[in-house]
Amino acid sequence: MQNRQTNQVFNFDKFPNFEKDIDPKQRAWIEVKGKAIETNVRQLRSKLSKNCQFMAVVKADGYGHDAKLVSEYAIKGGASQLGVATLNEGIKLRSSGVKKPILILGNLYTKRDLIICFKNDLMPTISSIRECLICNNIGKHFGLKFPLHLKVDTGMSRLGFEYNKFVQQFE
């Protein structure tokens, strides 16, 4: 066997601008075809009952594809609701002109956040009696009723009302 040196050092000084020559899109890129989103939603929607709601989840800026753009095509395809992860995402989408119901999938724990949610015509996800009581107090204070989504923990033990106690808590 030959005796080789294993720790050779490459002289990068000979190539001072080699990083600038690398195209970041060289190996990975994405092209969003709105018509494909619309067609996919329409196909999925066709498999559902006419009375069934269809929510397009567009969190993380439409999974990096522009939430407004993805939302527009999903709505054209028949999405009746949209879902986002955070209050800020919901506000941004609503202020972009989207009129459909928008559900905030993440929890809103404070009265302030819930008021902001309702003022922006967004629907919060509620997963505790405490949050229900806050919503009830806000509704009484403003003399209004607000739509909301109740999250029930059906086994993942993450968020939501405990399944076994859910009915008891609302009697």
Give residue spans per PLM region:
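Active-site-proximal beta-alpha core segment in soluble small-molecule metabolic enzymes
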Residues: 10-13, 18, 24, 28-32, ...
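Conserved PLP-enzyme active-site core in the AAT-like
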Residues: 47
